[in-house]
Amino acid sequence: MHWSMMTSSTSTCQDNGESAALERLCPDLANWPLSWQVAKDDVIIGQCIIEILKPFLHELLRQHLADRTLDRHRDHLWMLGGEIIRRRHDDPELCKQPVKTLLLNLIEEEGGPLIWPRISESQQNAFDATCRKLYRFLRQGETR
């Protein structure tokens, strides 16, 4: 068998495996934009958020983290997406920013935005840990 054919089929199997793992972790990922929706155009923005988050979710899966850790990161990413939509409605100026720019402005080396309605300090700290990880991942992607 030709080498390029072998790598192509291996890559396809790997992609299918990653897609299946992502489906197990986030069976409702396609519905996240609807769960965040306040206005009609929020679904499109939500889909953009999902496209930004998917590579990070795949990276988390490649790290072979414990199921509870993966679930926690997944839940925090869902919260972050909802917070992005909420903030766009609270501050119309944010609607002018591309979604990735807005996301990168909300997260930083220290963590993520304060969630509203308020969550406990320990919940916010856990959320911040996910945001720090996402921040590092997105910044590394910019330097590649």
Each language-model region and where it sits:
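Charge-rich, intrinsically disordered N-terminal extensions
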Residues: M1-R144
